[in-house]
């Protein structure tokens, strides 16, 4: 790990995204577009599936570093609350969100996806630097999510969503910073 990312500071400041001051009950007063709904549903799925990605990651050599393990504990917690906040927003705007949506999506995994997950875990035990693949993928995911939140926040006409998304983006920026600095 480089000195550019202070894991202790990250651990001390890690918390769920604060949405207590957002008036979700008034979100329905301002509609969202079909494109925003599609995008938010996808984002909610990504955030909700963090646990599935973590499950695969825990089978690999990527977790041999104690700083990585410390980060992952906080990361999965923060990502869960991102998905929850998006779900709360969507439900407040009148969209019904299936509570078992993540499970249903997970059950549609193909044999190939399952094989790749286990194969990667085995490769990680043989190739010393294979963990860098996971960290690179993590950095890409965090950066694209960060950018998507920022773009959607600029475009939406819904003031509640416009307030929520930068809060999520702030966490994604910290997550990206961790992965980026880990790869240096």
Segments the model singles out, each with a brief description of its role:
Residues 1-184:
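Non-heme di-metal
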């Amino acid at each position: 790990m480089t000195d550019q990312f202070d894991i202790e500071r990250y651990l001390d400041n890690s918390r769920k995204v604060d949405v207590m001051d957002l008036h979700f009950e008034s979100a329905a007063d301002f509609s969202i577009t079909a494109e925003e709904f599609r995008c938010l549903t996808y984002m909610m799925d990504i955030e909700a599936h963090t646990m599935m990605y973590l499950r695969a990651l825990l089978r690999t050599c990527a977790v041999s570093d104690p700083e990585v393990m410390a980060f992952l504990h906080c990361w999965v917690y923060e990502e869960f609350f991102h998905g929850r906040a998006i779900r709360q927003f969507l439900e407040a705007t009148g969209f019904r969100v299936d509570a078992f949506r993540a499970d249903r999506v997970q059950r549609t995994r193909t044999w190939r996806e399952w094989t790749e997950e286990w194969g990667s875990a085995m490769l990680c035990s043989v190739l010393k630097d294979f963990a860098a693949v996971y960290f690179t993928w993590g950095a890409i995911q965090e950066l694209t999510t960060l950018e998507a939140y920022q773009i959607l926040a600029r475009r939406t006409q819904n003031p509640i969503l416009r307030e929520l998304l930068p809060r999520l983006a702030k966490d994604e920026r910290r997550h990206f910073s961790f992965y980026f600095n880990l790869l240096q």
